């Protein structure tokens, strides 16, 4: 019997046959390409929204300017999303080339490299979102015990734009988590029986 083009042996061990493997690989590669395009777009959007965010407030004739570099968590968020966007662009181009060539991923070292890279970027973006979200909570509600002011009461526009950037960054993180699952599937299926011989290497 088969499911999604994957043959199943009597011992319930998945066996990927040559033609079926190419069909599955094409579907996986298409889903991967879509996700990488989403990550690239949202990553750039998040970095631009946060990185260009400034607001000037005049307090008793003194100008106070809020910018993303005032909070290290936001700097981390911009850098992490910039890295994620660049990485996804490179990997997206790899997907396009392999789809045009009609090749199937048989190289275990390459599969391990993609899997490891996706894991690193996923953890990086999740950490950046968590740090930025925590800093944003402090900016919105303050910390009375430490006498930290509610910064967003003074810099409303700045905080709103940061919030939009964080929402975009959350989309990047969730997409990277899903993409990590896809790259894990692409890697570990190479250890699941006969990989077949048809199709080019990539």
Curated annotation (Swiss-Prot):
Please report the name of this protein according to its UniProt entry: CASP-like protein 2B1
Question: Which sequence ranges are listed under topological domain Cytoplasmic?
Answer: 1-29, 94-109, 186-202
**Location in or out of the cell:** Cell membrane
In the record, the note on similarity to other proteins reads: Belongs to the Casparian strip membrane proteins (CASP) family.
Q: Which residues lie in coiled coils?
A: none
**GO CC terms of this entry:** plasma membrane
This chain's source organism reads: Vitis vinifera (Grape)
Task: Report the main location listed first in the record.
Answer: membrane
Subunit relationships: Homodimer and heterodimers.
Tell me what topology the record assigns in the membrane. Multi-pass membrane protein
What are the transmembrane regions?
30-50, 73-93, 110-130, 165-185
Q: Which of UniProt's keywords are assigned here?
A: Cell membrane, Membrane, Transmembrane, Transmembrane helix
What taxonomic classification does the UniProt entry list for its organism? Answer: Eukaryota, Viridiplantae, Streptophyta, Embryophyta, Tracheophyta
Extracellular compartment spans = 51-72, 131-164
């Amino acid at each position: 019997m088969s499911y999604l083009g994957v043959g199943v042996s009597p011992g319930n061990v998945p066996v990927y046959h040559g033609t079926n493997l190419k069909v599955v690989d094409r579907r996986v590669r298409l889903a991967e390409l879509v996700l990488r395009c989403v990550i690239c777009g949202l990553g750039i959007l998040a970095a631009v929204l946060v990185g260009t965010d400034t607001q000037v407030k005049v307090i008793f004739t003194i100008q106070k300017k809020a910018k993303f570099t005032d909070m290290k968590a936001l700097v981390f968020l911009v850098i992490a999303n910039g890295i994620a966007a660049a990485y996804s662009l490179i990997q997206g181009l790899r997907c396009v080339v392999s789809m045009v060539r009609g090749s199937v991923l048989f190289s275990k070292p390459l599969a391990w490299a993609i899997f490891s890279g996706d894991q690193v970027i996923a953890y990086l973006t999740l950490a950046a979102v968590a740090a930025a979200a925590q800093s944003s909570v402090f900016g919105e509600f303050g910390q009375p015990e430490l006498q930290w002011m509610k910064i967003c009461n003074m810099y409303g526009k700045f905080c709103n734009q940061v919030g939009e950037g964080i929402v975009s960054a959350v989309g990047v993180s969730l997409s990277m988590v899903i993409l990590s699952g896809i790259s894990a599937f692409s890697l570990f299926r190479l250890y699941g029986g006969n990989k077949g011989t048809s199709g080019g290497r990539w």
